[in-house]
Amino acid sequence: MTAAVFFGCAFIAFGPALALYVFTIATEPLRIIFLIAGAFFWLVSLLISSLVWFMARVIIDNKDGPTQKYLLIFGTFVSVYIQEMFRFAYYRLLKKASEGLKSINPGETAPSMRLLAYVSGLGFGIMSGVFSFVNTLSDSLGPGTVGIHGDSPQFFLYSAFMTLVIILLHVFWGIVFFDGCEKKKWGILLIVLLTHLLVSAQTFISSYYGINLASAFIILVLMGTWAFLAAGGSCRSLKLCLLCQDKDFLLYNQRSR
């Protein structure tokens, strides 16, 4: 039973991200490098936010329950803010690298910023999902474990779906964020930051897992639609994708008529 819970939750949380990696990134060495770099940037942001939280905890030096809760909220907000700052820093690094590649070799085709946004977002998401869920996932292997004592028996399942949402949201946030940077629409960056804060702070607002998960999925659908449009998607391109028909195939059919 515990093995089934472990593998089931693991595939729910990381299955889509693994599929995205295998089918869209694994065949391109350069994309793998950008993915690892994005994951590294997220790790550095986590390290800095952890140091800030630890310093705040040492300065306050109060172990009361309410104080610890406020420290946790403070740490969450600081972590989200630093993550988005590092997302912007990674964008600037990729932009400079792309411009440098064009100046050195004008004939070389640099990867598009939309592609880099997707790859970096997936790197952010995978690393975020691993750090947020791996401890919970390891607890599911405990002898006779169905849930955590005093909590919902569906805790592991909710956590798996929430990890899935966070990973995909990081992909969508990355695409929308880079698009806002490219167009110099700084309000878009603020929206990404606010939605990130909202999803991260849901557990402080409500203790009902079902409500938190439903609202997170709503944000996921909205951000996914926005990212699809920002990446140049349309109803026509979506239809062609679903029907497995590319542009050359359509032009050939039109010419034959």
Swiss-Prot record:
Subcellular location: Membrane
Keywords: Membrane, Notch signaling pathway, Transmembrane, Transmembrane helix
Transit peptide among keywords: no
Keyword match Glycoprotein: no
Membrane-topology annotation of the record: Multi-pass membrane protein
InterPro entries for the chain: Aph-1
Record field: transmembrane: 5-25, 32-52, 70-90, 115-135, 158-178, 186-206, 213-233
Molecular functions (GO terms): endopeptidase activator activity; protein-macromolecule adaptor activity
Main location: membrane
Role of this protein: Probable subunit of the gamma-secretase complex, an endoprotease complex that catalyzes the intramembrane cleavage of integral proteins such as Notch receptors and APP (amyloid-beta precursor protein). It probably represents a stabilizing cofactor for the presenilin homodimer that promotes the formation of a stable complex. Probably present in a minority of gamma-secretase complexes compared to APH1A.
This protein's name: Gamma-secretase subunit APH-1B
